[in-house]
């Protein structure tokens, strides 16, 4: 049975402190932190003793209030920028980390998220607009956003029926990372190799996302189908493959960097920035875009309807879109940005990095996620069956 991490393994003090620092930076969710450290029900007791488990210190309120709550993805920001924002405004940035767009949507649909800003992916925005979950943006409050500076491929999805609901953050691709010391030096290049290795030499060492769009989409690519397919027969083929590989997985989890770094996992579905971070730190870990195709995506900043600290939300978006601040973000997380102003500030070697900016033939084979996949019941039910098998 797949798992998040190795079960019942005692955690060392060093590992505990590493995970605590990741939690405090917003790199991982509270649920992840409690599961990995084994605190569980002890949280209430520990809250008084462990900084980061209790509410953070209230900052002196300025014009925008004392806090801003951001829902975002793992390893997707420079914590030093948040510290600078707090110094400038008095608003403390509190980060909620999520592993899928479905989680974000469900949280907003349930009401009372408490978020002021969140980071949805391109294909979800029309759903948020249709369900009146996000508000039209007042661009006068985001003077650092200059529409003309952004590549329209990665900014157009934020505008629905002529109204801007979201502004671009980063873009990237979905491929996989593989530790080549376990391939005998062989270079991988396809999704077929990913799935076939998982069933054989990499049994027990592969991770897939806890995210239906990418896990189902990349299983569909094994058969040459569209990444976004909702065709019942094609989904049935993908389910057969997923159920076949399920016993061979190390984990179903969207936070794959720790096991790839410590060697528990040898291969995992991955996003661009994680691929770049891992390859930089451990050169034998390579990022692969399957020749069959897959996903290209763009993420956005948006403000939920009813945001409790709305002015602080606008201030944070505007701050992060300052080209100099944005450049620091890119240098930290490794995801490309569509802002030409920011790109002028980045090192040439970064702009020429094949992980971040793949060859045209690889890019041309990729698909943007389709809105239909977010709410398609067949895909949601398939993922549920896969996870419970």
Language-model region placement:
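N-terminal secretory signal peptides
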Residues: 1-32, 56-57
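Conserved C-terminal helix/tail region of periplasmic/extracytoplasmic solute-binding proteins
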Residues: 8-12, 16, 22, 258, ...
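N-terminal export leaders
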Residues: 28-49
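Early extracytoplasmic/lumenal segment of secretory-pathway proteins
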Residues: 59-127
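A structural signal for short loop-to-beta-strand junctions that line the ligand-binding cleft
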Residues: 113-117, 135-139, 144-176, 204-206
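Short beta-strand->loop
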Residues: 135-146, 166, 283-295, 304-307
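Ligand-binding pocket segment of bilobal, Venus flytrap-like solute-binding proteins
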Residues: 207-211, 215-219, 223-290
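Mature extracytoplasmic/periplasmic domains
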Residues: 299, 304-364
């Amino acid at each position: 049975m797949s798992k998040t991490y190795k079960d019942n393994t005692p955690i060392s003090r060093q590992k505990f402190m590493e995970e605590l620092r990741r939690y405090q930076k917003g790199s991982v969710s509270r649920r992840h932190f409690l599961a990995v450290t084994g605190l569980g029900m002890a949280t209430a007791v520990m809250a008084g003793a462990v900084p980061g488990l209790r509410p953070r210190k209230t900052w002196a309120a300025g014009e925008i209030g004392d806090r801003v709550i951001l829902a975002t993805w793992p390893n997707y920001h420079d914590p030093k920028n948040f510290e600078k924002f707090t110094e400038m405004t008095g608003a403390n940035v509190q980060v909620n980390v999520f592993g899928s767009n479905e989680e974000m949507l469900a949280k907003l649909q349930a009401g009372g998220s408490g978020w002021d800003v969140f980071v949805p992916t391109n294909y979800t925005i029309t759903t948020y607009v249709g369900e009146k979950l996000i508000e039209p943006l007042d661009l006068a409050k985001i003077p650092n956003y200059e529409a003309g500076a952004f590549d329209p491929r990665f900014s157009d999805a934020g505008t629905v029926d002529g109204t801007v609901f979201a502004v671009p953050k980063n873009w990237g691709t979905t491929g996989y990372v593989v530790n080549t010391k376990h391939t005998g030096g062989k270079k991988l290049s396809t999704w077929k190799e990913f799935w076939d290795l998982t069933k054989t030499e990499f049994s027990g060492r592969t991770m897939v996302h806890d995210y239906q769009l990418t896990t189902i989409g990349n299983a569909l690519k094994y058969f040459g189908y569209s990444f976004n397919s909702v065709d019942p027969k094609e989904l049935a083929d993908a389910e057969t493959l997923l159920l076949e590989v399920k016993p061979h997985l190390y984990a179903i989890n969207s936070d794959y960097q720790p096991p790839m770094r410590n060697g528990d996992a040898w291969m995992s579905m991955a996003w661009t920035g994680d691929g770049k971070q891992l390859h930089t730190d451990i050169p034998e870990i390579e990022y692969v875009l399957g020749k069959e195709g897959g996903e290209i995506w763009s993420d956005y900043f948006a403000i939920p309807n009813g945001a409790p600290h709305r002015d602080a939300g606008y201030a944070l978006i505007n701050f992060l879109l300052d080209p100099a601040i944005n450049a620091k973000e890119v240098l930290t997380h490794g995801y490309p940005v569509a802002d030409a102003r920011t790109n002028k500030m980045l090192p040439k070697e970064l702009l020429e990095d094949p992980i971040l900016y793949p060859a045209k033939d690889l890019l041309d084979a990729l698909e943007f996620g389709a809105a239909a996949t977010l709410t398609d019941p067949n895909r949601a039910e398939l993922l549920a069956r896969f996870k419970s098998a």
